[in-house]
């Protein structure tokens, strides 16, 4: 009798384990069935880059593509959306996720949820060669009301600037990063602000000796980005995190992001739990 009871107990444990191991979120089931995930990206190399044939590459979508493959989702379909419009797109479920260097910020965590960090890096300015206004911090911009800076609406850099005393009237928003660099070249603004590697990539492509890179920016924390999801996709976020951890453990993660200039080590000690209030 004891053997029968023990066998039955073991059977129940196995059934429970199987359910835990193989149960999938409704979101993942849907994505696997349709064969693709719709992903919001911004055209900001090296985070994300839209090729002339429409193919989307870059560190963030390449990581997402690899993670989705592990999860059994065959294709990533990208939708180009500016950073400021990504959260509304996620909330409205126009996209399944966003992956394009969208920094994990406490205020954003009130509207969306994030995966574990996949890309971390410093901030930068582009200025006229010689840095005539000696701009090394956002406080330097704030100290001179005559100065104008450019960045994108909804970007982390906009918030960094406003938090450090830059007036809203000093900010001129660009539509795309290259158009922001064009403003700087034309003298319409005094400084361009964006992620470090994004700014560096733009200046290398522009190849203008009259422009200079200032990196890192003092007084600004290292920014970390992760894949972003609708607030209700907690189970899918957990599945994504498990696959991302697997990708990191195999070394494939480093092989994907390091050619773009990012460091796999930089994400090692980071977690969305410490960057989002209440560990959302």
Where are these regions (language model features)?
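Hydrophobic/proline-rich hinge and linker segments of small-molecule sensing/allosteric domains
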Residues: 38-42, 114-137, 227-230
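Extracytoplasmic small-molecule ligand-binding "clamshell" domains
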Residues: 23-101, 110
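Ligand-binding clefts/hinges and TM-proximal coupling segments of bilobed small-molecule sensing domains
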Residues: 25, 156-172, 212, 244-280
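Short helix-initiation/N-cap motifs at beta->coil->alpha
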Residues: 76-88, 133-136, 172-186, 221-223
